[in-house]
Amino acid sequence: MRWQGSSRRKATGGKIIAARGKRKFEMGRESAETRISDVKRKNVHTMGGNRKVRLLQSNVANITNPKDGKTVTATIETVIDNTANKHYVRRNILTKGSVIRTPVGTARVTSRPGQDGVINAVLIE
């Protein structure tokens, strides 16, 4: 779990004395770490009675060609580069900004698979 409350340190590095402890609503969740495999989704209930779709596994992506604006669904072969974490390349984990290899060509992921429940990508040269 990840705590998403405000920092206990000032900009100068000094400590802020907390007036209260941590609260449950400040708590985050584990990241989805979307892998390349058959499609597997999970619904998560969020604050306000809303819902998020976590994409746990997927082997397809909606790839848009920026030159002609056409979108095609293609299978994902592998992850080439990931700026979020260099170890995600070896584990084939998809995040926003990761570069993937597909039969259509090399593409950069533009959606957040763990938040949106779908993989959208743009072809790169």
UniProtKB/Swiss-Prot annotation:
GO terms for cellular component: ribonucleoprotein complex; ribosome. Keywords: Ribonucleoprotein, Ribosomal protein. InterPro entries: Ribosomal_eS8, Ribosomal_eS8_CS, Ribosomal_protein_eS8_arc, Ribosomal_Se8/biogenesis_NSA2. One of its GO terms (biological process) is translation. The keyword Ribonucleoprotein applies. It comes from the Archaea. GO terms for molecular function: structural constituent of ribosome. Part of the 30S ribosomal subunit. HAMAP family: Ribosomal_eS8 (MF_00029). Belongs to the eukaryotic ribosomal protein eS8 family. This is Small ribosomal subunit protein eS8. It comes from Methanosarcina mazei (strain ATCC BAA-159 / DSM 3647 / Goe1 / Go1 / JCM 11833 / OCM 88) (Methanosarcina frisia).
